[in-house]
């Protein structure tokens, strides 16, 4: 840690980058209607945006089970030639091992691209949280334009 330099400004310290996050309710509840143990109303969606195209690369799991965001990000980076301008991230739900995860990850990228007026293949997506739950897309549809 002796070679670490703390830079004021966080992720936005780098010229040309903007970031935002908010609570939209992804962590709110469980499918059985019970309150989620992680419902603490902390931010559960975030976006990072670059003013210009950036070189981007991914390091992916070798596990046979891959989360939908991993698959969609890998595809988008292949289509864009390794260029990205935005990252959309949610917490509280891993969007993994569910029936429509890939569709939801693609929709997160589409919503982000639309809000930022950039090509959808220049959006990468990440999710972290509980595995096996359906990702609620409505809170994300509401939140993305606000970020």
Question: Locations of the language-model features?
Answer:
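N-terminal amphipathic/basic leader segments beginning at the initiator methionine
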Residues: 1-65
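Glycine-rich anion/phosphate-binding loops
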Residues: 62-71, 99-109
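Short glycine-rich or small-residue beta-strand-to-loop segments that form or flank ligand, phosphate
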Residues: 86-98, 124-131
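Short glycine/serine/threonine-rich phosphate/pyrophosphate-binding segments
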Residues: 79-81, 96-99
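Glycine-rich oxoanion-binding loops at beta->alpha junctions
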Residues: 55-81
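Pocket-edge structural micro-motifs
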Residues: 49-51, 74, 91
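Glycine-rich, mobile lid/loop segments that gate access to catalytic sites or pores
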Residues: 103-107, 111-147
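Structural motif
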Residues: 44-47, 69, 85-89, 121-124
């Amino acid at each position: 840690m002796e070679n670490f330099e703390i830079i004021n400004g966080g992720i936005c310290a780098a010229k040309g980058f903007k970031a935002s996050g908010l609570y939209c309710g992804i962590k709110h509840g469980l499918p059985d209607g019970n309150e989620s143990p992680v419902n603490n109303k902390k931010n559960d969606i975030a976006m990072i945006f670059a003013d210009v195209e950036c070189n981007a690369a991914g390091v992916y799991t070798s596990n046979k089970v891959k989360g939908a965001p991993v698959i969609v990000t890998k595809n988008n980076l292949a289509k864009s030639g390794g260029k990205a301008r935005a990252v959309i991230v949610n917490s509280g739900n891993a969007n993994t091992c569910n029936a429509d995860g890939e569709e939801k990850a693609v929709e997160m990228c589409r919503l982000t691209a639309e809000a930022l007026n950039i090509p959808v293949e220049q959006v990468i997506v990440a999710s972290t949280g509980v595995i096996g739950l359906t990702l609620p897309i409505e809170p994300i549809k509401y939140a993305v334009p606000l970020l």
